[in-house]
Amino acid sequence: METAIEDAGLDRGPTLTSSWDAACGALTQSLFLTRTGPRAQDLDFEQLLEPPAPSQDPVSLKSSLSPRDENPCFIYLNCGPNGGEEILSVGVLSSARNMEVYLGEEYCGTSRGKTACTVLDDSEHEKILLYKKYLKLDSPTHACKIKLLSFGEKQCVLVSKVVVHLRPRSADPSPRSAALGSRIDLDNIQTIMESMGSRLSPGAQQLMSMIRFQQQNRLPIGDQLQSVLGSAGHKHLMALQSSPSPAVLDKASSTPFPFRTGLTPSAITENLKALIDKSAQPSGEGNTTNHDEGHLMPQNHSLESDLKNAVSSFLPKKASGSSSVPSSELLPFLQNLCSQVNHLRVGHNARWQENISKPREGMVGVPMEEQPVCSYLEKILSKNMELMEKKLMDHIDERIYQLQEHIDAKMALLVDLLRGPNSPPPGMPLRHYDSRERLSNGER
């Protein structure tokens, strides 16, 4: 393996910027690039992050806002989407003890620093410790951001080195390598829950089973959810699993997903019932689309079966073929789904607004303008929180008012006793009096 250590004074390579103020061009001088071949191996960051020569002063990053304002220190690495290289790992030698790495807005990992050396800060005339920390990314990327964390909310961070491990971008990157859920460590989550003495709810266990199946088969979890929630998403999954053609891809991309067409809980209930009923139909009663989909691999049938089982626990057993499923029982299930598929929702445009389903006649409890299910649940939760807050404040005010009346009554009784003919003379200690009343916590 050939490894080349190059300085930052190159025409090509990633750019290094910061959210805090730094001298013009000073931060770029701290950037060191490490390039390897396509089959890259791990580097020795312990050696690469060794303290520089005494003549090379660290770069000082300072916050332009007051300490009361929340303004974390970020440094940004960007190779450009059209560049020929991608980032494998990063290392930083700075006064910040820890660092967090993000791929866009997605958290990637945290690295805790080790003490490397001590430098003298000319502005403060004091010695400052520098810590070396590095992190290998789960998947190569062309851009990332690093959050530098210091204890005590310091408004100045010294950066001595930023080492970036690069390799040539692969010609045929796998689009499924960064699928949602691939970075979720389910075993670690289970261990943490057991150590806390907590148990997952049935809905959370079903969701973890779905994510585990997605990780084992390397399928995007969004496609699984679409397969559960509607026929349009189910057809989209079938098109992805079969051999792609331009016509199929165009049709799949233009097919409106259920979450993008403004579903209500009632519409989701109907889609779920249709999916369960579909499995009970005889093989000869299907339409032509079902015959065309018969050539799929067995794992597709396993996927459909597992997803049906994951949903069936949330649906009550049907007493007759004409019975309806109340949408209120799907609320916990929808709350879990909304948190997982929120990434699928983007801003509405005119094309999606045209596809919003109109309210059906005879349906009770459906608003005239059907809104996306996530917005629907958000309004319900927000209203319930406001009502809960109002009830709590009213209860507190009532208890304070009752306590004030009780104190006033006792004070008036005490004044009457002191003014009475049988009151003790001044200077004599008062006799202990027990009203036999108890406080709410049982004390007297």
Swiss-Prot record:
The modification Phosphoserine is found at residues 177, 182, 254, 302. Residues 279-300, 424-444 are annotated as: Disordered. It holds the Pfam family PAAT-like. Its main location: cytoplasm. The keyword Ribonucleoprotein does not apply. One of its GO terms (cellular component) is cytoplasm. It is an enzyme of class 3 (hydrolase). One of its GO terms (molecular function) is identical protein binding. It is found in: Cytoplasm; Mitochondrion. Residues 280-289 have a biased composition (Polar residues). InterPro entries: PAAT-like. Its EC number is 3.6.1.-. Homodimer. Interacts with ABCB7, ABCB8/MITOSUR and ABCB10. This is ATPase PAAT.
